[in-house]
Amino acid sequence: MHYSYYPYPVPYREDPVLIRNLQKAINGEFSAIQCYRKLAELAHSDEVRKQIEEIRRDEIRHLREFSTLYGSITGKHIMPKQTEECPDNFTRGLDAAFKDEQETVDFYLRAAEETSNLKAKGVFTRAARDEQNHAVWFLYYLMER
């Protein structure tokens, strides 16, 4: 009998759509983490800065969850890449963050529907809920301006 190193059966390891979606999610979360650090520094009040830092902590958790899932499926470690530039202006940063969060919700929900991997479904669905909440905060701060 052959025992595999990977915790997932072969069909999950050979799911190129799931692997591609995880790679995109990992790079997106990594980019958001970088941009939200900058956005928090540009914040006009402590209250706003603290909320953006809380959102950033959620993104760090998402990155960890997606990276762990990717590693357990592929047996490989992924080095995330920043795929988006961070605006230098607070209002433009809020606008970019709001749009990115909304697009990410759609992407994560679609990724959850496209896979039969129950762990991945759960991770993508929970992250989508968080991203929608983040979008609401960014929209709120945009409307304050």
Swiss-Prot record:
Q: Which residues form a coiled coil?
A: none
**What Gene Ontology molecular-function terms does this entry list?**
metal ion binding; oxidoreductase activity
Query: CDD domains given for it?
Result: Ferritin_like
Alphabetized Gene3D superfamilies for the sequence: IL-4 antagonist (De novo design) like domain
- Write down the superkingdom of origin: Bacteria
Task: Identify the InterPro entries for this entry.
Answer: Ferritin-like_SF, Rr_diiron-bd_dom
What is the protein name for this chain?
A: Uncharacterized protein YhjR
